[in-house]
């Protein structure tokens, strides 16, 4: 089993899809990496040699932010928005949708379960 960027890649999958198991690498990025190091998209992970795995690993390290580094960067970007006091930062702080979605009836994913208000009977 190949291990790249701290992630065990599934053996039987094609390498272009297996690389998408790494946080921060999608299908297009995966294909770009493989074309840069001249590895066929049809190869399975179990068919890769150690040299090919190290080539892929080196390319990812030098060109892309993945896994922990990327998660840390996203967290820091959100924290910076909150510290600035921007509208987006305030929405993050309040746990509400950030990108303009309506919140009168929806937004349950961000707001959580409904809170009961008032009493049921008089």
From Swiss-Prot:
GO cellular component entries: cytosol; small ribosomal subunit
One Pfam family cited in the UniProt record for this chain: Ribosomal_S13
GO biological process entries: translation
Reported function: Located at the top of the head of the 30S subunit, it contacts several helices of the 16S rRNA. In the 70S ribosome it contacts the 23S rRNA (bridge B1a) and protein L5 of the 50S subunit (bridge B1b), connecting the 2 subunits; these bridges are implicated in subunit movement. Contacts the tRNAs in the A and P-sites.
Listed NCBIfam families: uS13_bact
Subunit: Part of the 30S ribosomal subunit. Forms a loose heterodimer with protein S19. Forms two bridges to the 50S subunit in the 70S ribosome.
Annotated protein name in UniProt: Small ribosomal subunit protein uS13
Source species: Wolinella succinogenes (strain ATCC 29543 / DSM 1740 / CCUG 13145 / JCM 31913 / LMG 7466 / NCTC 11488 / FDC 602W) (Vibrio succinogenes)
Lineage: Bacteria, Pseudomonadati, Campylobacterota, Epsilonproteobacteria, Campylobacterales
């Amino acid at each position: 089993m190949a291990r790249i960027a701290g992630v065990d890649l599934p053996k039987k999958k094609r390498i272009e899809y297996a690389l998408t198991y790494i946080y921060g690498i999608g299908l297009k990025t995966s294909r770009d990496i493989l074309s840069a190091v001249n590895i066929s998209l049809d190869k399975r992970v179990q068919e890769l040699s150690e040299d090919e795995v190290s080539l892929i690993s080196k390319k990812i390290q030098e060109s892309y932010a993945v896994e922990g580094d990327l998660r840390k960067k996203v967290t820091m970007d959100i924290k910076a928005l909150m510290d600035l006091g921007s509208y987006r930062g305030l929405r993050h702080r309040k746990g509400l949708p950030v990108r303009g979605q309506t919140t009168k009836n929806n937004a349950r994913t961000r707001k959580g379960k409904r809170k009961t208000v008032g009493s049921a009977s008089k």
